[in-house]
Each structure stands twice: as structure tokens, then as C-alpha cells.
């Protein structure tokens, strides 16, 4: 079966200005949120919670292994998902709030010592869930492909969206610079001379702001946009594709 819409005229424009504006803002603040976590995660781990090198290696290995399994399952789910209101939009909408929450938890560790097994369990769980949610919420970017059957309009949407997203990826730097003015300043003896909060608190406030903006604008965007390009409801087995890869002699040549 094929999902159809009333009008699939590929010669006219389908996206309203408000729909375009809402979508670009939603994905823009998504890029800002992701950029905040990506750019400052290393500083948070090394200088705020002070996770030692061994535990960082353990964390990275476990998260990578579990992330592969979880990510594979999520990709299968997305590939076979076909909702009444679209393929990508419902997933991006439902996963927005959990993404905001676990993205925030990436910079919030409720343990005085991160180098304990309890804290490591917490960090692994948060990182794995967050990475899984990144895969789910990335469907917001895929939504642009099915918003219009008009190729020219689609290309214009993708170009506008890409340009704004590239700008918003740098927004966390501005946010950190602004909040940094109110961070504690210390003298040579380590005494606080000015400021209102620590660097840890600054990160928490900045990420909370990014999370709230992302959830608000992405939710609005996914409620406003429409998927207008039909798609096939046939479910494909991921193992069929994997079998073709395994049987390919070039795959084994490159692997070995």
C-alpha cells in the first residue's frame, strides 16, 4: 500500500511561510542543543566531574558497544515505521521531550565522585539513552525531504535549513561567553573575588536553556509541518541488506 495525499502536484509550492519558518527554527535550535553538548562535553568530563582516563576509556567502549546494538534496533524501527501522520514527523515529535531531558542529564551528574561504579553506571545509562535519542530525533532533519513533492521547493528548503543550522551550531559559544561573565573569578590564593556561580552551574544553566528552547521550537515545528510525499509501507528486513554486505568479497578484503 502507498500513502497518498489529496494533491501531489510537483509543479507548485506546498509549504507555507509559517510552516517553513517553524521548521527552520525547530531544527535550528536542535542543532544548537546538539552543538552545546558536543562542543563542551569533553571539558565537562575532564574538568568538572574529573573522570579519570581509565574510566573514560571504559565509558567510551561500553557506550560504543551498547550504542551499536541500540542504534541498530532504532534504525530498524524507523525504517519500518509508518504512522497515520507521517513517517518521520511523529518520531521527532514524541522523542523531543525525552531528548531534552537526557541531553540535560549529560551535564548533570548527581555524584560527588564520578569515579565510582554507581556514577559510572549512571554515566553509561545516560550516554546510551542520549545517543539513541539522537538517532530518533534526527528524523526531524529527514522530514524536510518529504514535506513537498516539488524538487525546487525541496532544495530551497534544504538550503535554507542547512544555512540556518550552521549558524545555530555556533550559538552555544555565544551562550557560554555571556554566562561566563557571571562565573566565579578567583584571585591567586583561590578565593572568590566576583561572580555568582561555578563553571559547573554555568554549564547546567546554559544546557537547560538550550534544552527548553529546543523542546519548545521542535514541538511547535513538528505540529505544524506536513509530510506530503507518499512512501511505501512494505517492511524490509535489515538482515537481508547485511547478508549482501557479508557476501561481498570487497567487504572482507577491506576488513582484513
Where are the predicted features?
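Membrane-embedded alpha-helical bundles of multi-pass transporters/translocases
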Residues: 2-256
Amino acid at each position: 500500500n502507498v500513502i497518498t495525499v489529496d494533491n501531489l502536484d510537483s509543479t507548485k509550492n506546498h509549504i507555507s511561510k509559517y510552516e517553513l519558518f517553524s521548521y527552520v527554527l525547530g531544527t535550528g535550535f536542535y542543532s544548537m542543543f546538539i552543538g552545546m553538548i558536543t562542543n563542551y562535553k569533553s571539558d565537562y568530563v575532564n574538568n568538572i566531574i574529573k573522570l579519570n582516563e581509565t574510566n573514560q576509556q571504559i565509558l567510551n567502549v561500553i557506550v560504543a558497544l551498547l550504542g551499536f546494538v541500540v542504534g541498530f534496533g532504532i534504525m530498524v524501527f524507523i525504517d519500518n515505521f509508518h504512522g497515520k501522520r507521517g513517517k518521520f514527523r511523529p518520531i521527532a515529535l514524541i522523542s523531543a521531550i525525552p531528548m531534552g531531558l537526557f541531553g540535560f542529564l549529560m551535564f548533570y551528574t548527581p555524584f560527588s565522585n564520578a569515579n565510582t561504579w554507581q556514577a559510572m553506571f549512571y554515566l553509561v545509562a545516560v550516554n546510551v539513552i542520549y545517543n539513541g535519542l539522537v538517532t530518533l530525533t534526527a528524523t526531524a532533519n529527514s522530514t524536510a525531504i518529504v514535506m513537498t513533492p516539488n524538487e525546487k521547493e525541496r532544495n530551497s528548503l534544504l538550503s535554507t535549513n542547512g544555512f540556518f543550522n550552521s549558524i545555530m551550531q555556533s550559538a552555544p559559544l555565544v551562550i557560554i561567553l555571556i554566562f561566563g561573565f557571571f562565573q566565579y573569578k578567583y584571585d591567586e590564593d583561590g578565593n572568590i573575588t566576583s561572580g555568582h556561580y561555578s563553571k559547573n552551574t554555568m554549564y547546567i544553566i546554559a544546557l537547560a536553556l538550550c534544552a527548553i528552547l529546543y523542546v519548545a521550537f521542535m514541538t511547535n515545528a513538528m505540529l505544524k509541518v506536513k509530510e506530503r510525499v507518499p512512501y511505501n509501507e512494505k517492511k524490509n528486513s535489515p538482515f537481508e541488506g547485511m547478508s549482501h554486505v557479508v557476501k561481498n568479497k570487497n567487504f572482507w578484503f577491506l576488513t582484513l
